[in-house]
């Protein structure tokens, strides 16, 4: 049985092989930059990739949908720009020539890190890792999507300076989570 995928925008069931959502009208083609996964890609048979949110030297962060439960997730793709050459039309990521061993080793480290975080969350102040998926010659960490406001925006919107006691109280669960990770 083929798993139905959900539109990453309106979360309604998509017919097979569509390039736009018949419900909300959003077009999937060309939404993400070259080298990233296309909107509407399926991972692990249960996650639909949405738009790229950010990218850094380690990889790309996408919005996404968990198709079985119908809830939003964040998908972190391991894509080290210094080691990765290109992504084929089949979405397979290829390492740069001469970087194959380092690419494979660091890919395994990425998977190990997110498996370790998965074991200690959600009991800590860290974002829960729901799944770790290996596909396309790389690894994807599927994270809970809590929504919310980014810290820099929240701080900019505050009229008063954040007191040290407030900052410590807010960050205590994060510190405890990091400490648990290093045990």
Label each PLM-derived region with a short phrase.
Residues 170-171:
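Activation segment signature within eukaryotic-like protein kinase domains
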Residues 30-49:
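A short, low-complexity linker immediately N-terminal to eukaryotic Hanks-type protein kinase catalytic domains
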Residues 50-56:
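Protein kinase glycine-rich loop
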Residues 151-162:
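AlphaC helix of the protein kinase catalytic domain
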Residues 67-111, 115:
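ATP-binding glycine-rich loop module of kinase domains
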Residues 135-150:
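Conserved short submotifs of the Hanks-type protein kinase catalytic core
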Residues 174-183:
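Protein kinase catalytic-loop region centered on the HRD/HxD motif
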Residues 131-132:
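Activation-segment/catalytic-loop signature of the eukaryotic protein kinase fold
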């Amino acid at each position: 049985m083929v798993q139905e995928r959900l539109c990453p925008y309106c979360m309604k069931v998509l017919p097979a092989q569509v390039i736009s959502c018949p419900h909300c009208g959003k077009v999937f083609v060309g939404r993400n930059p070259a080298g990233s996964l296309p909107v509407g890609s399926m991972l692990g048979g249960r996650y639909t990739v949405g738009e790229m949110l950010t990218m850094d030297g380690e990889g790309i962060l996408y919005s996404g949908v968990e198709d079985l439960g119908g809830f939003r997730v964040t998908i972190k793709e391991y894509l080290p720009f210094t080691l990765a050459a290109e992504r084929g039309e089949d979405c397979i990521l290829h390492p740069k020539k001469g970087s194959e061993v380092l690419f494979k080793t660091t890919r395994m480290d990425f998977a190990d890190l997110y498996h370790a975080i998965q074991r200690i969350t959600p009991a800590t102040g860290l974002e829960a890792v729901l799944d770790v998926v290996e596909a396309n010659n790389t690894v994807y960490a599927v994270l809970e999507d809590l929504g919310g406001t980014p810290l820099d925006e929240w701080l900019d919107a505050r009229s008063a300076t954040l007191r040290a006691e407030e900052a410590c109280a807010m960050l205590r669960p994060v510190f405890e989570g990091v400490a648990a990770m290093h045990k």
